[in-house]
């Protein structure tokens, strides 16, 4: 049985249920509430109140998402793109990526180690394959080049 979202209380309760499961951004929460049949007016009212009460926080959502995706082996470019697709402000995303405290060189090393077991490329074809994989994961090309050529990543 689905809940009818025609009152501010029902919209707020549904939003809080969604937030209890995990952090959400405002755009994502708006989309989910709209899919459940809530009006834009009721959604705005509920989300404004949740934000005032500190229950809805873009900063917390960014931090949580960056931590989750970086732990899954993704780099800053991929995470930035995913957050952009979710409707978050590019400036806020860039600031959150700078402030997150993730050691991207370590994450790159971990992703490479998991996929290739530390085997450096032995020919141009395998180098291109490893480079494509790591670039697709969202790591910067200069870091990938340093890793694959065996140079130190401590500068990052």
From Swiss-Prot:
Function, in words: Modulates RecA activity.
Cellular compartments annotated: Cytoplasm
UniProt keyword list: Cytoplasm
Pfam family, one: RecX_HTH1
GO terms under biological process: regulation of DNA repair
Protein name per UniProt: Regulatory protein RecX
Name of the gene this protein is made from: recX
Signal peptide interval: none
HAMAP family for this protein: RecX (MF_01114)
Source organism of this protein record: Pseudomonas putida (strain W619)
